[in-house]
UniProtKB/Swiss-Prot annotation:
It comes from the Bacteria. Its EC number is 3.2.1.8. Pathway: Glycan degradation; xylan degradation. Belongs to the glycosyl hydrolase 10 (cellulase F) family. Keywords: Carbohydrate metabolism, Glycosidase, Hydrolase, Polysaccharide degradation, Xylan degradation. It comes from Dictyoglomus sp. (strain B4A). This is Endo-1,4-beta-xylanase B. GO terms for biological process: xylan catabolic process.
Length: 10
């Protein structure tokens, strides 16, 4: 889990 837009996919 990252605090970036990647979090949307997480």
């Amino acid at each position: 889990a990252k605090k970036t837009i990647l979090d949307l996919k997480d």
